[in-house]
Amino acid sequence: FLPIVGKLLSGLL
């Protein structure tokens, strides 16, 4: 996954 997507996923978690 892209760093941006990973950041969004981390925000949801």
From Swiss-Prot:
Query: What family is this protein classified in?
Result: Belongs to the frog skin active peptide (FSAP) family. Temporin subfamily.
What is the protein's given name?
Answer: Temporin-1CSa
Which keywords appear in this protein's UniProt record, sorted alphabetically?
Answer: Amidation, Amphibian defense peptide, Antibiotic, Antimicrobial, Immunity, Innate immunity, Membrane, Secreted, Target cell membrane, Target membrane
Query: Which residues are annotated as modified residue Leucine amide in the UniProt record?
Result: 13
Where found? Secreted; Target cell membrane
Q: What is its main location?
A: secreted
Summarize tissue expression: Expressed by the skin glands.
Q: Does the keyword Secreted apply?
A: yes
What this chain does, per the record? Antibacterial peptide. Has activity against the Gram-positive bacterium S.aureus (MIC=8 uM) and the Gram-negative bacterium E.coli (MIC=128 uM). Has a moderate hemolytic activity (LC(50)=75 uM).
A GO cellular component annotation in the UniProt record: other organism cell membrane
Query: From which organism does this entry originate?
Result: Rana cascadae
Single Gene Ontology BP term?
A: defense response to bacterium
